[in-house]
Each structure stands twice: as C-alpha cells, then as structure tokens.
C-alpha cells in the first residue's frame, strides 16, 4: 500500500474524517478470501489484484451513468463515516471498539474491498509495483481522458509534477498531445518530467510562467492546463497560461477549504472552462 498526499491531509486534520482510523487507498495484493454472494467469475483466491481508491457501489444513479467518481453512497458512507456499504467497518481494536476505514484501510495487514473496486493484474507484475495504479494512475487517466477529453495535436501544461502530475504527462503524450509543458518549483522533478513525456519544462521559481508558456505556444497559450497540487497559486498559474477556448482541469486536493480567484470577464469572453476531475 502506498501513501497518498490526501492521506497526509487526513493525518494533519486538514481533511475531516472520523478517528481512530486506518488510512491507505493505493493498494494491490493477493486475494485470500471471497465474500459470500460473489457473482463475478473474474476473481479467485490466490489472484493478484489492484484496488481503486474509489469504491463505487455500481448501482446508484451516478454509477449507472458511468460516473462512478460521483458515487453518492461511497461518499456518504465511506468518506463521511468510514464504513463500507453495509454500514460497518471491518476493523477494530483489541477491545472490540471500531476503527474507521478511509477507503479500504489499506495500511492494515488485511483489507476488505468491494469487488467493484479491484481488477486482476498480470502475474509478471508485482503488487509492489502496481499499488499506484488505483490512485495516481487512475486519477491521471481520468483527468486526461474524461476531464479534459484531450484531442490529438492539442497543447498541454501540467502545473505541479508530483505523482499524479507525472502520470498526466505520460498519458497526455501517449494520447497525442503535440506539446507537453511541465511546470514545477523543483528542478529534479522537471528533469524527471522529461522522461515522462514533457517536451518543455518551466521552473516557477525562476521563470515567469505566462511569458514562458506564451513563447512556447506562439502566443496562444495551452489548450489544456492541468493543476495537480490544490493550491490557489497553482490554480492561478494554470488559468493564466490557458488559451482562448481552453480547459483548465484541477485534480489536486487542497488542505482544508481553500478558494482561488477566477477572472470572470476573461473566462466568459475567451470561452474558457474549469472542469474538476477526481
């Protein structure tokens, strides 16, 4: 199980969640038991699987519409109360008192995951190397494929190139982006960004982001700007480098309740869109 930055927000109290709890939603491992009533034939004891940080019910209005990222029961039961769909947690202390689960509570030795939230992984891939698939990789893919609806030949910028941002670079390049610009404050991350698909890099500490991106794009700005940190400053950067008709796709979760300013007239007159993706 990996440790996501949102886990750190919960640990620090910036994201409210019941306590005591077990965190961890970047999971992969081996099935040791199948619950009663399991109907799917794709899963078997001894099989390696990767889990998804979202655990959609598969039955609500959002799930039926293909928007499992908006699953109402998941957010009402798990994210607010720390329980699974039967209203119960699977974790307790030695005295039998409940310990709440953030997603599946993957940092425990064993975890219970709904069948809708796991997928088999090939035998030649180890669980250690595939734990990231259900969070950083899935979040990045959803942002590029569904959030931005990236089209071949478009220009892309990624503001903040950590775990999710780096995966966005890779997916954007694979899906046909003509330019992929990485923006960060860390030169080491920007060097790594080149290996993930970035065609250009900008250090936000030493370079004016808008001027640099406008020069790289012949004065137009980027068609899609992804914001992967969840801070007002990076929101402003992403909006500031956006082309007319462009889409800004924020992915990063902020620490607690934060707000970013949006220039109303520019957004309206230039037909720019802000499309959240989770």
For each predicted feature, which ranges?
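Glycine-rich beta-strand-centered segment in the early N-terminal region that forms part
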Residues: 12-64, 68-69, 77-79, 122-124
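Conserved amphipathic alpha-helix within the SDR
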Residues: 209-219
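Mid-domain Rossmann-like dinucleotide-binding core that forms the NAD(H)/NADP(H) cofactor-binding site
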Residues: 109-110, 116-118, 122-207, 211
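A residue-level detector for short acidic-glycine micro-motifs
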Residues: 2, 33-37, 160
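Cysteine-cluster motifs in flexible loop/terminal segments that predominantly coordinate metals
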Residues: 40-42, 52-116
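Glycine-rich phosphate-binding loop and adjacent beta-alpha segment
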Residues: 177, 194, 204, 231-278
């Amino acid at each position: 199980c990996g440790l996501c930055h949102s886990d750190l927000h919960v640990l620090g109290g910036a994201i409210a969640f019941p306590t005591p709890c077990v965190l961890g939603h970047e999971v992969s491992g081996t099935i040791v038991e199948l619950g009663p009533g399991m109907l799917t034939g794709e899963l078997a004891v001894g099989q390696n699987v990767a889990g998804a940080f979202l655990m959609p019910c598969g039955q609500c209005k959002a799930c039926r519409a293909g928007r499992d990222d908006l699953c109402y029961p998941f957010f009402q039961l798990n994210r607010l109360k720390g329980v699974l769909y039967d209203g119960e947690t699977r974790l307790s202390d030695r005295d039998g008192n409940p310990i709440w689960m953030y997603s599946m509570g993957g940092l425990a030795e064993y975890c219970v995951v709904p069948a809708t939230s796991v997928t088999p992984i090939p035998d030649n891939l180890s669980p250690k190397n595939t734990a990231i698939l259900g969070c950083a990789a899935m979040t990045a893919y959803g942002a590029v494929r569904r959030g931005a609806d990236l089209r071949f030949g478009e220009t892309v910028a990624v503001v903040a190139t950590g775990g999710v941002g780096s995966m966005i670079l890779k997916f954007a390049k694979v899906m046909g982006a003509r330019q992929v610009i990485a923006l960060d404050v860390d030169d080491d991350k920007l060097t790594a960004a080149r290996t993930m698909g970035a065609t250009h890099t900008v250090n936000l500490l030493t370079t004016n982001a808008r001027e640099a991106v406008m020069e790289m794009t012949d004065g137009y700005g980027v068609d899609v700007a992804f914001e992967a940190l969840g801070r007002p400053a990076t929101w402003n950067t992403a909006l500031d480098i956006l082309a007319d008709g462009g889409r800004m796709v924020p992915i990063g979760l902020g620490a607690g309740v934060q707000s970013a300013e949006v220039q109303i007239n520019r957004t309206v007159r230039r037909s720019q869109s802000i499309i959240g993706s989770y």
